[in-house]
Amino acid sequence: MIKILQFGEGNFLRAFAEHYIQTSNENGIYDGKVAICQPRKNTKVINALKEQDCKYNILLKGRLNGEIINEVKSVNCVEECIDTVGEYEELKRIFCLDSLEIVISNTTEAGICFIDTDKMSESPNVSFPAKVTALLYERFKQGKKGLVFLPVELIENNGDELKKCIIKYAKLWNLENKYIDYINNECSFCNTLVDRIVTGKAKYQDDECAVACEPYSSWIIEADERAKNIIP
C-alpha cells in the first residue's frame, strides 16, 4: 500500500529516505510503500527503475561506531515510479489515495521557490511548490485527509518555506479560503535537516540503479503532534 510519495529520484534520496523506509518495514515499525516521481523532465532514472520493477541496492561502506561496515541493503519498498510529465494523471491519482500520508521531496536548494507566472491550468506546473499546490487542491476537493510534508532541500526552515510558497500560489490562483484553512490546519510541513554522504552510482551485479553511501545517517525532523503520530 502506497503511503509515501517522493518527489526526487536522485542518488541521495534513494540512498537516504528509502534506506529508512526499507529498514522500518523490515523491523516491523512501519508498513508502507513508496511512489517516486521526478520533479523535472529528465526521466532517465525513472525509466531505469521501471526496468528493474522499482527494485535496487544500497551499498553501505565505511566506519560506524568504530566498526568497518561493508554491506548491501536490498530495497523493495518502492511500488511505483512515475513520469511527472508523461504520467501526470497517474501522479494525481497517487496524490489523492486514501492511504497516502507523507510527501518527501528533494528538488535541490533552488526547488522551493515561487514563480508568479505559474498557472493553475498548467499540468504539471513549472515549480515544485506549484505542482504540490495543484495536486493538494485535488486532494482537498475530494475530501481526503491532510498530508505530512518532509522536504529535505538544504535551505533553512525548508518546511516553512514550502508552506509559504503553497499558500502564495493558492492566493495567486484565487482558490477558496477553505483550501488555505486545509493547508494550515490539516497538513503538517516539517522543517528537516539531513546528513549522509552519498558517493553516487555504484557497480553491483546487473543493478543499473545501485547507489553507494556511508553507513552513518541522521534525519532531524521538527514535527508537530500530528506528524509525530504518522512518521515511523
Residue positions per predicted region:
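Substrate/ligand-engaging "lid" and interaction regions
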Residues: 1-232
